[in-house]
Amino acid sequence: MATRITNKGLSKSSKAWMKEHLDDHYVQLAQKEGYRARAAYKLLEINEKTNLIKKGMTVVDLGSAPGSWSQVAGRLVGDEGILIASDILPMDALENVTFIQGDFREEAVFDRLMSEVGDRQVDVVLSDMAPNTSGHTAVDQPRMIYLCELAVDFALRVLPKGGSLVMKVFQGEGEQQLRQQLQSQFSKVRTIKPAASRPRSKEVFWVATK
């Protein structure tokens, strides 16, 4: 049975967040259109601008839970495509999606992903990974940069020339150094801030083509 969310017992700041969340255009749209989270519209806009994900492609979705990016990517690649998703959190099953639950920072999980990819040519790697934020930038930012570095390492291993990485990044310390590294490893890197990203959010998305 679903549990109804109420304002009872919430702090003032939590009540404000809840009101903003429930009033959010993209939250309402996601509920109406059957997406698991508003984040779906970030990937939809990114793909609208880049046309990266197409029918029949093989896509890997890192940090996939609750599954909205996998929903979008799955519809874009269609029945002929292949979608492999992974997250430290559980994710309800999606048709034609192979899900690997585990911590991407652990070598065993990385190896399971590589094994699932096998000899396939991966066309696009998606990374919406982010750490559990503490509210302290000095702690959160290095954790985010580390996850990005892991995503880049994975992408470099599985993407052929012409393949692409779409990766969430937090603006802040270490970001420019990471971008310089990316520019030396990929032929093209562009930044997209989707309309569905909240204006105050530090997140941007880099689209890197090998």
Swiss-Prot record:
The keyword Methyltransferase applies. It is found in: Cytoplasm. It comes from the Bacteria. The active site is at residue 168. Pfam families: FtsJ (PF01728). GO terms for cellular component: cytoplasm. S-adenosyl-L-methionine binds at residues 67, 69, 87, 103, 128. Keywords: Cytoplasm, Methyltransferase, rRNA processing, S-adenosyl-L-methionine, Transferase. GO terms for molecular function: rRNA (uridine-2'-O-)-methyltransferase activity. It catalyses: uridine(2552) in 23S rRNA + S-adenosyl-L-methionine = 2'-O-methyluridine(2552) in 23S rRNA + S-adenosyl-L-homocysteine + H(+). Its EC number is 2.1.1.166. Specifically methylates the uridine in position 2552 of 23S rRNA at the 2'-O position of the ribose in the fully assembled 50S ribosomal subunit. Belongs to the class I-like SAM-binding methyltransferase superfamily. RNA methyltransferase RlmE family. This is Ribosomal RNA large subunit methyltransferase E. The gene is rlmE.
